[in-house]
From Swiss-Prot:
It is found in: Cytoplasm. Cell wall formation. This is UDP-N-acetylmuramate--L-alanine ligase. ATP binds at residues 132-138. GO terms for biological process: cell division; cell wall organization; peptidoglycan biosynthetic process; regulation of cell shape. Pathway: Cell wall biogenesis; peptidoglycan biosynthesis. The keyword ATP-binding applies.
């Protein structure tokens, strides 16, 4: 990057070729090292022997974890933080005027997007990428869990923690000794164009991130291109119309090594153009049992032998998790795990952190935290909640994520949230956006949309409450024995769980 040129940060620009390896980076500095995706990559490079440090705005569980590994984290972003670095890594949340970007540019240092680091880590590995609007973290976590149980010791880069036994969490990054790497492939900024995986899993192609892609056609085209870069197999859900449209748009040579999956029986589907098909025969969860029963009908193209009908009993609820399991198990079998071993391991998977994660129970009121931040994810979450807690009142505190997403999907959010009994909408988590650019968008945008739904929202109490702490106390006051309260969203709503549990204990507590 020339020092005389203006600073342009392009996450789609590929900085490395297939021959590059971690040792080529030299001392590496991460801007925003505590971010979900950044911390995982920093930890993996550290395990590869690269000298890693970073900066962030504030302490977090992620930065604490990195510091325990011996990685230096500076708090506050300043020019001097990059003085010793040869490579500086940024995410799409970092702007060109960031003081560390400016200093690195002035010094002629190598500046690369986080996706460049992930692409480099894939070099020389059998890489499995998991892309899609929904289900990336759960699917990649489940696949990693299956492979670990199979003794493969995979590397994995997952944008979150994995639920372990007894309420523990396992880190989402690991540099294994095996030749497999499992990674979430973030489609939000187009940077997954750099990846050339052995297996490309596409969990869902429903429209999202239209602030980047502009329209649904360009969004779907990005998935078609991503599938075309897979050197082995493509695994794609066709339960949604957009997924089926992507499959239909694939060139014939790509379809020939594509495995579609879904809940519709094969004979009821249109011609798949030569793609194989995994049918998910899902049985309803026995009310309140905590077990999702299904049968996967795996074709010969997956098993490399005779077709197999494999029973699976999942501890993660909902039809959406049956789909996630179909993708994870299919990929594991393609990588050499037996169908039975893959299914057994999937049955011991407890979920990714912040995915239907029970945080506590007070006075017979259960608090569950979930990352859902798209209308389809919220609908799937609440459907699963009704299956898991059939006799309970379902209450939701929802923090919208991004003003643009709230604007695009206000009516869809209202319709999905109508599946709950009580809903409070908190202030919007801005992430990379600014309220000033969306002056008319607020929690009331969704509440107003709900008012126009008529029958769909009948019986659902829904209110806007900007302050999350106040929202938690209000919901605690409304709760009764046997209720389930969900904190929902991709922002910092998860930090309210302890406030909510404390408020439930006393029905009054300050947030101080």
């Amino acid at each position: 990057m020339s020092q005389d040129q203006p600073i342009v940060l392009d996450p789609t620009y590929a900085s490395f070729d297939a021959a590059a390896r971690p040792a080529d980076l030299g001392a590496t500095h991460f801007i925003g090292i505590g971010g979900a995706g950044m911390s995982v990559l920093a930890e993996m490079l550290h395990a590869e022997g690269v000298a890693v440090d970073g900066s962030d705005r504030a302490h977090s569980a992620k930065t604490d974890r990195l510091e325990t590994l011996g990685i230096t984290v500076e708090f506050g972003q300043r020019a001097e933080n990059v003085a010793q670095a040869e490579t500086v890594v940024y995410s799409s949340a970092i702007k060109p005027d960031n003081p560390e970007i400016v200093a690195a540019h002035a010094a002629g240092k190598r500046i690369v997007h986080r996706s460049d680091i992930l692409a480099l880590l894939m070099n020389g590995k059998r890489a499995v990428t998991v892309a899609g609007a929904h289900g990336k973290t759960t699917t990649s976590s489940m696949l990693s869990h299956i492979l670990v149980n199979a003794g493969a010791d995979p590397s994995y880069a997952i944008g979150g923690f994995i639920q372990g036994p007894d309420g523990t969490t396992l880190d989402g990054g690991h540099a294994g000794k095996g030749d497999i790497l499992v990674a979430e492939a973030d489609e939000s900024d187009g940077s997954f164009a750099k990846y050339h995986p052995t297996i490309a899993i596409i969990t869902n192609c429903e429209a999202d991130h239209l602030d980047h892609y502009g329209d649904e056609a360009h969004y779907r085209a990005a998935f078609v291109a991503h599938a075309g870069r897979a050197t082995g197999h493509v695994i794609i859900s066709i339960d949604d119309p957009d997924g089926l449209a992507v499959l239909e748009a694939l060139p014939a040579d790509v379809k020939s090594h594509t495995v579609a999956y879904g809940t519709t029986a094969r004979e009821s589907l249109p011609d798949l153009g030569g793609a194989a098909y995994v049918w998910i025969a899902s049985e309803s969860e026995t009310a309140g049992s905590g077990v999702e029963q299904l049968t996967l009908h795996l074709p010969a193209a997956v098993t490399a032998g005779e077709p197999v009908s494999q029973s699976v009993a999942l501890k993660v609820p909902g039809v959406h998790n049956a789909r996630n399991a179909a993708a994870a198990i299919s990929a594991a079998v393609l990588l050499g795990v037996s169908p039975a071993d893959a299914a057994n391991a999937a049955g011991t998977f407890l979920g990714a952190a912040r995915r239907f994660q029970v945080r506590g129970t007070v006075k017979q009121v259960t608090v569950v935290d979930d990352y859902a931040h798209h209308p389809t994810e919220i609908a799937a979450l609440l459907d699963a909640a009704r299956r898991r807690y059939p006799d309970s009142t379902i209450r939701v505190i929802f923090q919208p994520h991004l003003f643009s997403r709230t604007k695009f999907f206000a009516h869809q959010f209202a319709k999905s949230l109508a599946k709950a009994d009580d809903v409070i909408i908190t202030g919007i988590f801005p992430a990379r956006e600014k309220q000033a650019d969306f002056p008319d968008i607020s929690p009331s945008t969704i509440v107003d949309a709900a008012a126009g739904l008529k029958d769909a929202s009948a019986g659902t109490w829904i209110q806007p409450v900007e302050d999350m702490c106040l929202a938690a106390k209000m919901m605690a006051m409304r709760a009764h024995h046997g209720d389930v309260i969900f904190t929902v969203g991709a922002g910092d709503i998860t930090d309210m769980d302890q406030v909510l549990l404390t408020a439930l204990e006393a029905h009054r507590e300050s947030c101080e």
